[in-house]
C-alpha cells in the first residue's frame, strides 16, 4: 500500500501495522457482508454472546473500543434488525441491559 519508506523505525512499524489492520478489516468486511453483518455489528454480537454477567451499552463500548454514542446508534440499528434487545431500566437497576436474540446468536456463529 505504501510505496515509500519512513526514516524512523517507529513510523515504519506503524505503517506496516496499519496496512495489516486495513487488509484484515477488508477481508472481514467482505466475509461478514455475506451474512449481512459489519465488523462492528459482529463485535457487538460476539461481546453479547461471550460476556459473562450483565452487559450494558457502556460495557459494550469498552469491550469493542468504541465511544458510548457510537454504540448507542449501532444498538438502535441492531435492535431494529432483531439482533439484540435492550431491557429498560428496572427498579433497583441503574442501567439498560443488552441481550443477544436468537437471530443474533445464529449470525454470531459458534
Per-region residue spans from a language model:
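N-terminal positioning helix adjacent to the helix-turn-helix/winged-helix DNA-binding module
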Residues: 9, 13, 40-41, 56, ...
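Short acidic/polar alpha-helix capping motifs at helix-coil junctions
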Residues: 7-10, 41, 50, 83-86
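N-terminal helix-turn-helix DNA-binding core of bacterial DNA-binding proteins
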Residues: 22, 26-70, 91
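Terminal interaction helix/tail motif
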Residues: 109-110
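A structural signal for alpha-helical segments
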Residues: 4-8, 12, 95, 99, ...
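Canonical helix-turn-helix DNA-binding module
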Residues: 52-105
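N-terminal leader segment of winged-helix/HTH proteins
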Residues: 1-35
Amino acid at each position: 500500500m505504501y510505496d515509500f519508506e519512513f526514516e524512523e523505525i517507529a513510523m515504519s512499524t506503524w505503517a506496516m501495522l496499519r496496512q495489516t489492520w486495513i487488509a484484515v478489516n477488508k477481508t472481514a468486511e467482505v466475509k461478514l457482508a455475506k451474512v449481512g453483518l459489519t465488523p462492528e455489528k459482529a463485535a457487538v454480537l460476539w461481546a453479547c454472546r461471550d460476556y459473562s454477567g450483565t452487559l450494558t451499552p457502556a460495557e459494550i463500548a469498552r469491550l469493542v473500543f468504541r465511544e458510548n454514542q457510537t454504540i448507542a446508534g449501532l444498538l438502535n440499528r441492531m435492535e431494529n434488525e432483531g439482533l439484540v434487545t435492550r431491557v429498560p431500566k428496572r427498579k433497583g437497576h441503574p442501567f439498560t441491559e443488552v441481550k443477544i436474540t436468537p437471530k443474533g446468536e445464529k449470525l454470531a456463529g459458534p
